Amino acid sequence: MHLHFTPRQIVEKLDQYIIGQKDAKKAVAVALRNRYRRSKLAENLRDEIAPKNILMIGPTGVGKTEVARRMAKLVGAPFIKVEATKFTEVGYVGRDVESMVRDLVETSVRIVKEEMVVKVQDKAEEQANQRLVEILVPSPEKQSGFKNPLEMLFGGAQNSNQTSDTQEDVEIEKKRQDVERKLAAGLLEEEIVSIEVTEQQSSMFDMLQGTGMEQMGMNFQDALGSFMPKKTKKRKLSVKEARKLLSNEEAQRLIDMDEVTQEAVYRAEQLGIIFIDEIDKIAGKQSNSVDVSREGVQRDILPIVEGSNVATKYGSVKTDYILFVAAGAFHMSKPSDLIPELQGRFPIRVELTKLSTDDFVKILIEPDNALIKQYMALLATEGIEIEFSDEAIRKIAEIAYQVNQDTDNIGARRLHTIMEKLLEDLSFEASEITLEKITITPQYVEEKLATIAKNKDVSQFIL
């Protein structure tokens, strides 16, 4: 965990991936730093301080989700994104709101498990190599298959065979040492071996996914799995692939699942972040009789956000200190349309601004994962170096902004459709092009995009 970052450092890290939205970055940076501050307090005072939940307001594609996701990734906190519209009021078929907490704990378990696996990786690989040696040079018992039953009962011929057995053991030990050296040197990577691996069985309870009954299915599955034998199957693989499978099996044996569960539940409770998207879609005091009550979903979310205990397969989880970040465009409604109790649970309000042409220019070139860098890297695999002139980048940004104004404003996501259309022919013909370097000019952008962008009827379907 990396909770030691200062708010300024967090904002600087977020600036590497997200353009603009300073207010949103500051809000999440302070929320993260307050978690660090809270961890330094005496226990009696620590229990009194709950995180201040955040409500992000802004149109689609301006970075609401990305700010929260990058924040969680930065500190290694368990993070999940859910859509408020996916939940239904208690009593209706569909996902209940408590499933978001169960999903968060599952994510936390996965993160902790991966960390534990990394810690035991060297030992697991060592044991996997030992198993490979035994597979490549099997012991005499495995080679001979079975012994004479009378010999096993009465010990006949034991003395006469003892010397030959000892010699055979020495021979096998020499062979194994030789194989160990070759494995360490990587000389047997393509050798084919037959190994037994635990079969991953698809559960009949998978059909319960999305019905709100997943927890019941998991409990049944755990109960059955405790006394049902695990199935194994033989697979023929190269030594390289077999080592990966065997290392994974050995790592699973080496880690203590009780320790994993304990740490995962602690992280989910104390450091977890739940991002509730499209919360504006359940705002509104009126509801049609044929629809599942949106206000009912809000009332179900309320106790989770306020702080309650949720039963999961890993035990009871407290939601008192989980940070909730809600987001919505609020085109058709406003934050005050949420029920007053829920409004009060999101004291920090942040409004994200619409993206300008200058923002689009920065998005195209500045972030570490900038869109233009991605396309340059993709086409470089075909031996083609493409570069964009500054004027061409400005032209792309202007067209993206104009199309957003003329049709639906989908923010930075518009750049993906614009870039795909711009480089469509080049991507199609890349494997046949003999040129090593191609420069994208404003004229090329104009030729590929301007006509479509100017025609409103066409652009709303293509761009």
From Swiss-Prot:
NCBIfam families: hslU, PRK05201.1
Binding sites annotated in the UniProt record for ATP: I19, G61, V62, G63, K64, T65, E66, D277, E341, R413
Family annotation (PANTHER family): ATP-DEPENDENT CLP PROTEASE ATP-BINDING SUBUNIT CLPX-LIKE, MITOCHONDRIAL-RELATED, ATP-DEPENDENT PROTEASE ATPASE SUBUNIT HSLU
Subunit structure: A double ring-shaped homohexamer of HslV is capped on each side by a ring-shaped HslU homohexamer. The assembly of the HslU/HslV complex is dependent on binding of ATP.
Alphabetized SMART domains for the sequence: AAA (SM00382), ClpB_D2-small (SM01086)
UniProt key word Cytoplasm: yes
Protein name: ATP-dependent protease ATPase subunit HslU
Function statement: ATPase subunit of a proteasome-like degradation complex; this subunit has chaperone activity. The binding of ATP and its subsequent hydrolysis by HslU are essential for unfolding of protein substrates subsequently hydrolyzed by HslV. HslU recognizes the N-terminal part of its protein substrates and unfolds these before they are guided to HslV for hydrolysis.
Alphabetic keyword roster: ATP-binding, Chaperone, Cytoplasm, Nucleotide-binding
Name of the gene encoding the protein in the UniProt record: hslU
GO MF annotations, alphabetized: ATP binding; ATP hydrolysis activity; peptidase activity; proteasome-activating activity
Subcellular locations according to the entry: Cytoplasm
CC annotations in GO: HslUV protease complex
